[in-house]
């Protein structure tokens, strides 16, 4: 399998180095779809109340465990969707993503939404990985 990052010269550069405009995979044999991950511990407790960075770090650790279960890593992620309750948390989210997605980052969409499944949750992410 080969991975090619797509950032054409005539397309605006990504605002942050934690995503690419596109990702092309060839010869991928398996796709892994990671459901929306949130900042919850294994007992269902919200982690990092009122702290978007802490929540992003926890949900990315949860995502890492799901990817590992499939035999994948963050290097295999081709698409990431981010759902934020407050766009003022944009910088905190990208700071957390930078721990996982600086080398050949995935394509990504980030949107603000009115609420998540629990009132203390500030961010949710889902992903697609290719193996």
Feature roles, as predicted:
Residues 1-61, 65-78, 84-131:
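N-terminal presequence-like segments and the immediate start of the first folded domain
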